């Protein structure tokens, strides 16, 4: 990926290095629409959504409004990522699910379409809580072949995965005709993903970091990132915020990153991660932060499902 701010393009498929996340708890179409318009004004060009988030429609509305107002010249100025939900992770449901996403967005294509989790559920199960009977085996090959068809049809300019362990990514790469362009995973200073990053670099798969600030305030998030004494000390010494230090650290790893704020001042603050860098000593201090995965995804673990433990889900990599 090339250097630069929110509009910087990646070498392979044009993914800006900094994207705005839109995962929210409960439908909030109007706040999302307004926030996306503010983000476009601030300089964001990459917007991350998913069928599960129920934010595709307001993103599409904001994009159309931004074109009409002249804030952007055309849809092509934006990079839109969306994701296939688990209940549509079946060979015959992938293409219809993407068509529904495109209808929601009122767009002809998405720039990146991702398998949200290496998990399949019974069709129609979109809302938590999920029950043990909802989970069915994940047919990775069948799902990926359907994803490849979405790409061949031009409905997804690039395809990829989310939350794939090293083992699952290796398995996918062993048979994929079109390799995944991206693995979107949790990355932050308390979960640095060194092993996965090395594999992705070797295989040419771009890491896109979600929850770079720890997702504090969500039902599964943690304040362990923002409360880190190491990060606070570095931020104070550099005259930056803890959030900026975290985002700069992710940026320096070569990752794309997804960060969410609906506050305009913080949107701009989160873009201010270029033009300065961490020192080698600061990088080493961050490298020494104790590691613990925040998003463990216990909701996908069931005695009666394919993943009976966290070790099964993450292949012993957490």
Curated annotation (Swiss-Prot):
**Which EC numbers characterise this protein's activity in its record?**
1.1.1.285
Keyword check for Iron = yes
Q: Which organism is it from?
A: Oryza sativa subsp. japonica (Rice)
Role according to the record? Catalyzes the reduction of a 3''-keto intermediate during the biosynthesis of 2'-deoxymugineic acid (DMA) from L-Met. Involved in the formation of phytosiderophores (MAs) belonging to the mugineic acid family and required to acquire iron.
InterPro entries attached to this UniProt entry = AKR (IPR020471), AKR4A/B (IPR044497), Aldo/ket_reductase_CS (IPR018170), NADP_OxRdtase_dom (IPR023210), NADP_OxRdtase_dom_sf (IPR036812)
**Tissue expression profile of the protein:** Confined to cells participating in long distance transport (e.g. in the parts of pericycle cells adjacent to the protoxylem and metaxylem) in roots and to vascular bundles in shoots.
> Which keywords, in A-to-Z order, does the entry hold?
Iron, NADP, Oxidoreductase
Q: Which residues bind NADP(+)?
A: 48, 162-163, 184, 262-270, 277-285
Quote the Gene3D superfamilies the UniProt record gives: NADP-dependent oxidoreductase domain
Q: Name one GO cellular component term.
A: cytosol
CDD domains associated with the record: AKR_AKR4A_4B
| pH curve summary | Optimum pH is 8-9.
What PROSITE patterns does the record point to? ALDOKETO_REDUCTASE_1, ALDOKETO_REDUCTASE_2, ALDOKETO_REDUCTASE_3
Oxidoreductase: present as a keyword of the record? Answer: yes
Query: Which one of the record's GO molecular function terms can you name?
Result: 3''-deamino-3''-oxonicotianamine reductase activity
Q: Pfam families in the record, alphabetically? A: Aldo_ket_red (PF00248)
Mention one GO biological process in which this protein takes part, according to its record: siderophore biosynthetic process
* Residue numbers binding substrate: 116
Q: Could you tell me what this protein is called?
A: Deoxymugineic acid synthase 1
Pathway of this protein?
Answer: Siderophore biosynthesis
In this protein, the active site sits at: 53 (proton donor)
Signal peptide annotation: none
Catalysis performed (reactions)? 2'-deoxymugineate + NAD(+) = 3''-deamino-3''-oxonicotianamine + NADH + H(+); 2'-deoxymugineate + NADP(+) = 3''-deamino-3''-oxonicotianamine + NADPH + H(+)
Expression induction or repression? Up-regulated under iron-deficient conditions in root and shoot tissues. Slightly induced in shoots by zinc deficiency.
Q: Which family does it belong to?
A: Belongs to the aldo/keto reductase family.
């Amino acid at each position: 990926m090339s250097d630069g701010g929110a509009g910087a393009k990646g070498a392979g498929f044009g993914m800006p290095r900094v994207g705005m996340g839109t995962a929210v708890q409960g439908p909030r179409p109007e706040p999302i629409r307004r926030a996306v318009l503010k983000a476009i004004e601030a300089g964001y060009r990459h917007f991350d959504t998913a069928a599960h988030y129920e934010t595709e429609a307001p993103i599409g509305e904001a994009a159309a409004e931004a074109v009409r107002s002249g804030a952007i010249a055309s849809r092509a100025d934006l990079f839109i990522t969306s994701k296939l939900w688990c209940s549509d992770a079946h060979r015959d449901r992938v293409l219809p699910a993407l068509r529904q996403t495109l209808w929601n967005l009122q767009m002809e294509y998405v720039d990146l379409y991702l398998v949200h989790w290496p998990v399949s559920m019974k069709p129609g199960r979109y809302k938590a809580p999920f029950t043990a009977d909802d989970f069915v085996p994940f047919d990775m090959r069948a799902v990926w072949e359907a994803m490849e068809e979405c790409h061949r049809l031009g409905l997804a300019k690039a395809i990829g995965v989310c939350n794939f362990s090293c083992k699952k990514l290796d398995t996918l790469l062993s048979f994929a005709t079109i390799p995944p362009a991206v693995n979107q995973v949790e990355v932050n200073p308390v979960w640095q993903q060194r092993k996965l990053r090395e594999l992705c670099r070797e295989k040419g798969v771009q890491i896109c970091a979600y929850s770079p600030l720890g997702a504090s305030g969500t039902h599964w998030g943690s304040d362990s990132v923002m409360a880190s004494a190491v990060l606070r000390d570095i931020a104070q010494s550099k005259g930056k915020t803890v959030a900026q230090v975290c985002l700069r650290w992710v940026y320096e790893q070569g990752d794309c990153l997804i960060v969410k704020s609906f506050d305009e001042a913080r949107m701009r603050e989160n873009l201010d991660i270029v033009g300065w860098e961490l020192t080698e000593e600061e990088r080493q201090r961050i490298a020494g932060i104790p590691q613990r995965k925040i998003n463990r995804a216990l909701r996908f673990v069931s005695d009666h499902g394919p993943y009976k433990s966290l070790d099964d889900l993450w292949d012993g990599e957490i």
